[in-house]
Amino acid sequence: MIIFREQLIALLPIIVIGITIVGIMLSIIYSRNQFKHAVLTIIGMIIASVSSLLHMMWSMNKSGQNFFQLICIDNFSVLYVILIMFVGIASSILGYVWLVYYPVYRSDEFYLLLLIASIGGILLVITNHLIVLFLGIELISISICGLISYPVFSKKSIELSIKYIILSGVSSSFLLFGIVFIYCKTGSLSFIDIKEILSTYNNVNHMLSQPSMTLIVIGLSMMMIGMGFKLSCVPFHLWISDIYQGTPTAVSMYLATGSKIAVTAVLMRFLLILPDQYNELLHIFLSVSACCSMLFGSLMAIPQISIKRMLAYSSITNAGYLLIALIALRMNNCAIIQESISVYLVSYLFANVGVWGIVNIVSTAYIQKEKNDADTIYLYHGLFWREPMLSVIFVIAILSLAGIPMTFGFIGKFYLLFIGISNQLWFLTVMMIISSIISMFYYLKIITNLFNSNFVNNTNINYDILKKWMIKPEGFMVIIVAIIILFFGVYPQFIVNLIQQFVI
């Protein structure tokens, strides 16, 4: 097949990130300069985002570019490529500041792993083939394994890396076995071919009446298990709290946002190829997981004193919310549902960048004495009375994560409630409301600690370093994020209109 100019433009994000990886590798040979490589990483991701928009403008009113039935680059994929690049930029900024204060040897390779994970995320959002899907997930998983173990002086990090490798390997095995079972019956790994073959069967009962067709059900079930691990929904969540707590903040943020966005995007594509006769099967599986994720995540976060563990369980809860939207998407594939999922993911992304950014800022003032992040909630006692602006930004990000009105997070959660009610998912919608109410307990616990006047001077925090947060790149980033959260919380129509241009 000849690759034409339009297709070359469509592939530019991957090409740009690939060139950036090669450039940094060659640069490391001659000299190690963390600042230079961090800047190169950010520039590469910005160019990749711009190139995605160029493709969208070039192929206006077109369905997208297909390559050998392997990938499909359309407006939908452009949005999620931009989101993944934004996560990568934010992680690069947080990672740079963290590496400045942590004595980690060979810090330049941190950005290589981050870029490789970003390529994996891009492959997931543009995939139109099960092999590309598996390749994208593995690129993310392998890169994350390296990023988790980056603090090589910490035995805990090495232990967590081994745990993640084992559990990730198990989930990938389930995913690969599911792909094999589907291929055994359909004879194809292309989404388009699989959709056509599965559509030839009238219903699931007819399918199950043929012994060989049970391979499809087994394959789909195993693939959902593999995806469930990557999405960190119950009961595939056991790894998440330890990993979030023990890894660098930049890596935890990438896990909470980048990988979740990429997996959600590929699930949207994959679920849309399955015929309607699979609705009942998928509805049961996703509903049970959604209910358990929402309740378990909210309840388990309440007794935690570790902010990172709270955010881990919050991530589980939000995975449950996303499953409700995916169920609605299966029941009624329309633009408003895809728009709702996208709005929620964007609001979730900004809230997480704000929260994790503040944790990273405080950690740089804490790890001067202790080689750990500022994870314990008591380290934030009375922070408002020393750094009021930093605390206000922290409160804005947390309130957005909780879905409080006048924040962008409320708009995202409102969209999910709307599609839940519109598709008559009454029980799941009620569970979502209950879970949101429960989650307020641990979100408010963080906020009240900030305003506790009994602990104004925390001896574990170097306030001379902390007061310089505004002149750091991560300080500028969280200020911008807080402004965006408030602006889109008051005037969401701008971002909603923008996202409408990207729906499938």
UniProtKB/Swiss-Prot annotation:
The gene is nuoN. Pfam families: Proton_antipo_M. It is found in: Cell inner membrane. Its EC number is 7.1.1.-. One of its GO terms (molecular function) is NADH dehydrogenase (ubiquinone) activity. InterPro entries: NADH-Q_OxRdtase_suN/2, ND/Mrp_TM. NDH-1 is composed of 13 different subunits. Subunits NuoA, H, J, K, L, M, N constitute the membrane sector of the complex. It comes from the Bacteria. It catalyses: a quinone + NADH + 5 H(+)(in) = a quinol + NAD(+) + 4 H(+)(out). This is NADH-quinone oxidoreductase subunit N. Keywords: Cell inner membrane, Cell membrane, Membrane, NAD, Quinone, Translocase, Transmembrane, Transmembrane helix, Transport, Ubiquinone. Belongs to the complex I subunit 2 family. NDH-1 shuttles electrons from NADH, via FMN and iron-sulfur (Fe-S) centers, to quinones in the respiratory chain. The immediate electron acceptor for the enzyme in this species is believed to be ubiquinone. Couples the redox reaction to proton translocation (for every two electrons transferred, four hydrogen ions are translocated across the cytoplasmic membrane), and thus conserves the redox energy in a proton gradient. GO terms for cellular component: plasma membrane. One of its GO terms (biological process) is ATP synthesis coupled electron transport. Its main location: membrane. It is a multi-pass membrane protein. It is an enzyme of class 7 (translocase). The chain crosses the membrane at residues 9-29, 38-58, 78-98, 114-134, 135-155, 164-184, 216-236, 254-274, 282-302, 309-329, 341-361, 392-412, 425-447, 476-496.
